[in-house]
Amino acid sequence: MQLQNLTLQKITAVGIFLGGCALAVYASSMAAEGNMRTLILIFAAIVGGIFIINLKENFWLILPVGLSLNLPTIPLGFRQISSQELAITLATLLFILRIAMHNQPIKLRPIWSWPIFFYLACVALSFTLRPVGLWAFGSNSGGARFYVQIALAFSAFLILSSIVPKERHLKFILIACLFGNLLTAGWNVLSYFLFPAFTWLTTTPTAFAEEESFYTWHQALSQVSLPVYTFILAIMPFQRLLSVKNIFWSIPCLIACLVVTALSGKRAAMAMMFLFPLIIALARKEYLYLLLGGILASVLLSIAVLGQGRLFVLPLAAQRTLVNLPGQWDTRVLASTTGLDREEKDVFRTAMKEKAWQIIKDKPFTGRGLSIDLKEMVALIQTNQGEDKKTMDALASGSSWHHKWLGISADIGVPAAVFYGFFNLLLLILYILLVVRSCNQGWFYAFSLFQLCMVVKFILFSTTGGHTATSPMDEWWIYGIGLAIFSSLSSAKDLNKGQPDLPKTASINR
């Protein structure tokens, strides 16, 4: 054991030295070019490296931290390796190293993970039938990066399902995810104004486009408000949350989250602001607060809907958030969401669905593959089609179908979509069981409630968003750590059988 530790220390020291030399040379060249953005990223990499070294056997914590972020890191040609991809790659290397040192078990958990393995088989078949190169994680046909992302998602699942999480780890993960969402949202907003080429906010399709659009950088606001709102509701019961001791900070924070979400223009996120308290209240059996919350929600929505256009005028982004309710909404908001000439239908998503169905009918079992033909993209840019049609075709080429199930079916076949459906079902069942089993067990319970809400969001959002490759990046790690928690709680329960009851330690849920 001492020899293994000494060898590991030597390997780490050599790796740090070589990495530091390479980083110093690269930073010098960037400084000479005046590339401040890259220098900032290098500084962040140094801080992250120190953080990873100090984690030691808790190296896996870089996964939830990195996956909660969505920032560009290392430039690779004309592409960027995201913080999510970098975090999983680093964790995978450390995982393999620990396996080689006989310090790390591997737990496949086939009873729970079989849908993931079948999904991977469908992905492998798709890649075999339509292989693409791996240059810069994308090749000139643009699709290999998606296959790499799916492989990374599986690696994150495997690592997290093999660990033994403790209560302090779950607390750290929740708080780190909040900071990660805050940093990502802040980066997206700043990038919109300073680095528009590096943000997804500038490419979001909208029928209403002008210099000061009400649905551009505003979208990033819900990335912060919804997780913070859910975190506050998950860490303590409503009875304690609304007590005299906490009401002076809890109510203002919850109201602020509602306002920020309204200003984001995200209708689905606003719906979650009312659904998540319902889920948490039912889980805790706080039926009185459930009734009071329903009355309060009805009052707030009535004031906003009935007062709009009569007593006050809401910001356009807030109107977009509430536009599905009957009210006097601005015509520009209606034009950007309903199309006006299509009887309240979303023209954009309807067209995307029709295109996906065409591919599914032609190739129902294997899909068209996760690839983009460069010649087709150039031809698309050179056509005289309308801007909306170009946007739709470009997003479809990149597998951004705005419908997870149709997208998976079109990309890698209907069987893959069926297996992913089973995965989502097991994911939901797992976190329901975790909520029941971890009831009033401090951060185990808070984490389970928080992630249960996120799982419900994944499922409900699947018909308006999702992606064949990025959805596994978002969801599989949550499944992996959920299985690890479930196994840990089951083991603890078995150990406690037949033993006398001991006094419970302080819990955040009391």
Regions inferred by a protein language model and the residue ranges of each:
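Aromatic-anchored transmembrane helix interface
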Residues: S82-T92, W114-A121, W135-S162, F172, ...
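Transmembrane alpha-helices of multi-pass inner-membrane enzymes
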Residues: I235, P277, Y289, Y420-L430, ...
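Long extracytoplasmic/lumenal interhelical loops at the membrane interface
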Residues: G339-E354, Q358-I412, Y431, V435-S438
